[in-house]
Each structure stands twice: as structure tokens, then as C-alpha cells.
């Protein structure tokens, strides 16, 4: 009996072991081999990356905007730069012909798109449909700065930004608004008190830290990772604009207060000068932009913008600043070709260069070239009859965009420091008598030109 029991037990153990072995073989063949095969197939390029959170969010967003006829275009600097580097590949790719996600699957927290607000016909309906599709959306609004000069309309609110989150990825929709002279503007993304600061990592947003101004881009449609999107026709021009896009508004409230204290000059002569000065500024901007030379409003023209949002009627000229490293040898010829003859040339490229051109109606264009030192910047001046040199010192500054007399132009971002350097703490008080050699608080003597150089550094026409 004992022997039989041992044989039975042995047989049962053998049978059980065999069954378990067969199960392992079956499991390996039908499960593990399938998984490994799928992984191998994926690694060989059969639709790699199209299950990524980023691509799925972008695809759903494009479906939403396409179905609702919302004309968005891609402005994400990272993706645009990648597209630009691989543009031949993108240009020759048709929808559905790709096997690998190259652009939209790049790890990141946001993808930035934009639209021009005047082309958006169904804003509220779009917002509701987006949430029905699974997006969690946040809308940022603020007062329309274009109406700040009009008391009765200055409280009107406009949409500035949408952030729509799907799973772990968010779409940042930047709303561009038209401004004068055909450029686009977006507002500051300022979070109100009730907004959840943990909704998305706001600090990683590439647009909205401050208002921005951009040239209106020409758009083209391309297929990127199997998705049809609009992008700027010159992607790198847009990308290069981003870090230099900061925009500051004219101070309309302070300008109104200024004119309550000091009545505006609306005489025929003042109106005529402002008209001529505006036309001269437009012509100068067109000429310098064509040359690719950046400039900013300087001296009295900058003071007029900052203090009264207008041209100072008794200034009698237009003042611009240019960094000396941006000087081009064909500047003089370009202005002459534009109908502005050279009135005088002082200094030289290496030291204290200054150009003056004669506009119509006796309005003069003065261009001051700025030189950078370790802890300050300066521009020079020259007295023609004596050869004396002067230097005007400014704290270091960067450039921002603004709007002035219906134009998009640069001004120093650190405007108050710039104005106070040139005009002192009493810059709010109009001064009609001004001695360029003594009045500015930042002027100092800078030697005298050797007589042997006068023919080069003092040229009057």
C-alpha cells in the first residue's frame, strides 16, 4: 500500500510538472513573444511616438480649431526652430506618410499657438466645445490698451490668452490684436487672485511675461508629424523676434494730467510741425528698417513720447539713437536716396559720430550714435566752430517696442532713467530754451578735436 501511494504521488508530481512546463511554453509563445515582437516592431519605426501626451494634445487641439474654423498658427519657438532645421523633410512630407513623430513629441510642458482676434468669429462657442472635448481651459482677459486714450472706452476687456490642458500637456493660445501700422500685439498674462497657481507651470510659458509686439507674419500650411498646421513663412524671423518683443504702452493717464497742467499747443504752426515731424519719422523708420538698422526714439522725441504721448511742438527736430555697432556705411546714401540731404556729420565711427539730415519744412533729423562702456553708455557732441567735444552719459538700457504717432518704434525699456539722465528730475516741466552744451545734466567735456582732423570730423553742408 505504501509502495502504491509512493508511485501515485510520483506520477501526480510528474503530471503536474509537465502541465506547468506546458503552460510556461504557451505563455511565452502567445504573450511574451507578442509583447516583445510589438516592441521590436515599434523600434523599427512603425508609428513611433504617436502615443505621446504632447502629440495627442496637439492633434485634438488642431481638430477642435479646424472644425470650428479658428485660424490658429504655430508660434512655439522650440518647434518652429526644429521645423526650420528640417524644412526640406517637412516640405516633402504628406499627411499620413510618416512613421515617426519628430516635432510635436519633443518633451515639453506647453505648445504655443496664436490667432488674430479679428478673425475669430465664435469665441464663446469654441471655449465650451473645448471643454466638452476634455480640455480644461483657462481664459485670461484684461483692459484693451488701445482704448486708454479714450476715457469712455478705457475699461473694455479683451481676451489675451487661453491655456487649455489635456492630461499632462497644455496648449497656450496667444491672442494677437491688431495695432496701428499693421503689427500684432499680445498682452501680459497676469493671473487674477482666484486663479489656481498650480493649474500649469506658468513660469515656463514663453509668451505673456510681458506684452509683446510682432511683425504680422505671412503664413503657410505644412504637414508636421501627420498634422496640418499653419506656420510663419519665415519661421526663424518669428523665433528671433520673441526675445526682443517686449512692448510698453504710452502713459496716457499721465499725458492727460500733463495737458491739464500745461495746455497743449494747437496753433496752426504747432499742428504743421507735428505733421511734418511725423512724416519725417515715418521716412526715417522706413529707411533704417530697409537697411536692417535698429533705432530708438531719443532726446526730445523720447521725452515727448514719455511725457505727453506726442511730439513736442517746440522741439523743431526728430531725434533717434543707434548703437554704434549697428552703423552701416551706406546709411548716408540711403537717406539721401530717400530725399533727405546730409546737413552735417560730426565725429567718426570710432568716436562721437553724429549725423543730421534736412527734412522738409525745415524739420531736421538728428541721429546720435551710442557707445557702450563697462557700466554706462554715451553719445557724443561736437561744437563746429571750436572743435570742442562733449559726452552725454546714460545708464545702460535695453530696447522695448512702443506705439508712437501710429508707428511701432523702439524706446529704452528703462525710460525713466534714460529721461532723467538727459533732462534731470524736473523733466515734467516744459523747457523751451535749451542749450545742448550746458542744459543736460549728463553732459561733460570730452576734449577737443585736433585741427588736423577737422575736415573729417566736422562736415557742414
Swiss-Prot record:
<feature type="glycosylation site" description="N-linked (GlcNAc...) asparagine">
    <location>
        <position position="92"/>
    </location>
</feature>
<comment type="function">
    <text>Catalyzes the transfer of CDP-ribitol to the distal N-acetylgalactosamine of the phosphorylated O-mannosyl trisaccharide (N-acetylgalactosamine-beta-3-N-acetylglucosamine-beta-4-(phosphate-6-)mannose), a carbohydrate structure present in alpha-dystroglycan (DAG1). This constitutes the first step in the formation of the ribitol 5-phosphate tandem repeat which links the phosphorylated O-mannosyl trisaccharide to the ligand binding moiety composed of repeats of 3-xylosyl-alpha-1,3-glucuronic acid-beta-1.</text>
</comment>
<comment type="subunit">
    <text>Forms a complex composed of FKTN/fukutin, FKRP and RXYLT1/TMEM5. Interacts (via transmembrane domain) with POMGNT1; the interaction is direct and is required for normal POMGNT1 location in Golgi membranes.</text>
</comment>
<keyword id="KW-0325">Glycoprotein</keyword>
<keyword id="KW-0333">Golgi apparatus</keyword>
<dbReference type="GO" id="GO:0016780">
    <property type="term" value="F:phosphotransferase activity, for other substituted phosphate groups"/>
</dbReference>
<keyword id="KW-1133">Transmembrane helix</keyword>
<protein>
    <recommendedName>
        <fullName>Ribitol-5-phosphate transferase FKTN</fullName>
        <ecNumber>2.7.8.-</ecNumber>
    </recommendedName>
</protein>
<keyword id="KW-0472">Membrane</keyword>
<dbReference type="InterPro" id="IPR007074">
    <property type="entry name" value="LicD/FKTN/FKRP_NTP_transf"/>
</dbReference>
<feature type="topological domain" description="Cytoplasmic">
    <location>
        <begin position="1"/>
        <end position="7"/>
    </location>
</feature>
<dbReference type="GO" id="GO:0000139">
    <property type="term" value="C:Golgi membrane"/>
</dbReference>
<feature type="region of interest" description="Required and sufficient for interaction with POMGNT1">
    <location>
        <begin position="6"/>
        <end position="27"/>
    </location>
</feature>
<comment type="pathway">
    <text>Protein modification; protein glycosylation.</text>
</comment>
<dbReference type="GO" id="GO:0005794">
    <property type="term" value="C:Golgi apparatus"/>
</dbReference>
<keyword id="KW-0808">Transferase</keyword>
<dbReference type="GO" id="GO:0035269">
    <property type="term" value="P:protein O-linked mannosylation"/>
</dbReference>
<keyword id="KW-0735">Signal-anchor</keyword>
<dbReference type="Pfam" id="PF04991">
    <property type="entry name" value="LicD"/>
</dbReference>
<feature type="topological domain" description="Lumenal">
    <location>
        <begin position="29"/>
        <end position="461"/>
    </location>
</feature>
<dbReference type="GO" id="GO:0006493">
    <property type="term" value="P:protein O-linked glycosylation"/>
</dbReference>
<dbReference type="InterPro" id="IPR009644">
    <property type="entry name" value="FKTN-rel"/>
</dbReference>
<keyword id="KW-0812">Transmembrane</keyword>
<keyword id="KW-0539">Nucleus</keyword>
<keyword id="KW-0963">Cytoplasm</keyword>
<dbReference type="GO" id="GO:0005801">
    <property type="term" value="C:cis-Golgi network"/>
</dbReference>
<dbReference type="InterPro" id="IPR045587">
    <property type="entry name" value="FKTN_N"/>
</dbReference>
<dbReference type="Pfam" id="PF19737">
    <property type="entry name" value="FKTN_N"/>
</dbReference>
<dbReference type="GO" id="GO:0005634">
    <property type="term" value="C:nucleus"/>
</dbReference>
<feature type="transmembrane region" description="Helical; Signal-anchor for type II membrane protein">
    <location>
        <begin position="8"/>
        <end position="28"/>
    </location>
</feature>
<comment type="similarity">
    <text>Belongs to the LicD transferase family.</text>
</comment>
Amino acid at each position: 500500500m505504501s509502495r502504491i501511494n509512493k508511485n501515485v504521488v510520483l506520477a501526480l508530481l510528474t503530471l503536474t510538472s509537465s502541465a506547468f512546463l506546458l503552460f510556461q511554453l504557451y505563455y511565452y509563445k502567445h504573450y511574451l513573444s507578442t509583447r516583445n515582437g510589438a516592441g521590436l516592431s515599434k523600434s523599427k519605426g512603425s508609428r513611433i511616438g504617436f502615443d505621446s501626451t504632447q502629440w495627442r494634445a496637439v492633434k485634438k487641439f488642431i481638430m477642435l480649431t479646424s472644425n470650428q474654423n479658428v485660424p490658429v498658427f504655430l508660434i512655439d519657438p522650440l518647434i518652429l526652430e526644429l521645423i526650420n532645421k528640417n524644412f526640406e523633410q517637412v516640405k516633402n512630407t504628406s499627411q499620413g506618410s510618416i512613421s515617426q513623430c519628430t516635432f510635436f513629441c519633443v518633451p515639453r510642458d506647453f505648445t504655443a499657438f496664436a490667432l488674430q482676434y479679428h478673425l475669430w468669429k465664435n469665441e464663446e462657442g469654441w471655449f465650451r466645445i473645448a471643454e466638452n472635448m476634455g480640455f480644461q481651459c483657462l481664459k485670461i482677459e484684461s483692459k484693451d490698451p488701445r482704448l486708454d486714450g479714450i476715457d469712455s472706452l478705457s475699461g473694455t476687456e479683451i481676451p489675451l490668452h487661453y491655456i487649455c490642458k489635456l492630461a499632462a500637456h497644455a496648449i497656450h493660445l496667444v491672442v494677437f490684436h491688431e495695432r496701428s501700422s499693421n503689427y500684432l500685439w499680445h498682452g501680459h498674462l497676469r493671473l487674477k487672485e482666484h486663479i489656481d497657481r498650480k493649474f500649469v507651470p506658468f513660469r515656463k510659458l514663453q509668451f505673456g511675461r510681458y506684452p509683446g509686439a510682432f511683425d504680422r507674419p505671412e503664413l503657410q500650411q505644412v504637414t508636421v508629424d501627420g498634422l496640418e498646421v499653419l506656420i510663419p513663412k519665415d519661421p526663424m524671423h518669428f523665433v528671433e523676434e520673441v526675445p526682443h518683443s517686449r512692448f510698453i504702452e504710452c502713459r496716457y493717464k499721465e499725458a492727460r494730467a500733463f495737458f491739464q497742467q500745461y495746455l497743449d499747443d494747437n496753433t496752426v504752426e504747432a499742428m504743421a510741425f507735428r505733421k511734418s515731424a511725423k512724416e519725417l519719422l515715418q521716412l526715417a523708420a522706413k529707411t533704417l528698417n530697409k537697411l536692417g538698422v535698429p533705432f530708438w526714439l531719443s532726446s526730445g522725441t523720447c521725452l515727448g513720447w514719455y511725457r505727453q504721448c506726442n511730439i513736442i511742438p517746440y522741439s523743431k527736430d526728430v531725434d533717434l539713437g543707434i548703437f554704434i555697432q549697428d552703423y552701416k556705411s551706406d546709411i548716408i546714401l540711403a537717406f539721401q536716396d530717400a530725399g533727405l540731404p546730409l546737413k552735417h556729420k560730426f565725429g567718426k565711427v570710432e568716436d562721437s559720430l553724429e549725423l543730421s539730415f534736412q527734412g522738409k519744412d525745415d524739420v531736421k533729423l538728428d541721429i546720435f550714435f551710442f557707445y557702450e562702456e563697462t557700466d554706462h553708455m554715451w553719445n557724443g557732441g561736437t561744437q563746429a566752430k571750436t572743435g570742442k567735444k562733449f559726452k552725454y552719459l546714460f545708464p545702460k538700457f535695453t530696447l522695448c517696442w512702443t506705439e508712437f504717432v501710429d508707428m511701432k518704434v523702439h524706446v529704452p525699456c528703462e525710460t525713466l532713467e534714460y529721461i532723467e539722465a538727459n533732462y534731470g528730475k524736473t523733466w515734467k516741466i516744459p523747457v523751451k530754451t535749451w542749450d545742448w552744451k550746458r542744459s543736460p545734466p549728463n553732459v561733460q567735456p570730452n576734449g577737443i578735436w585736433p585741427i588736423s582732423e577737422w575736415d573729417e570730423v566736422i562736415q557742414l553742408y
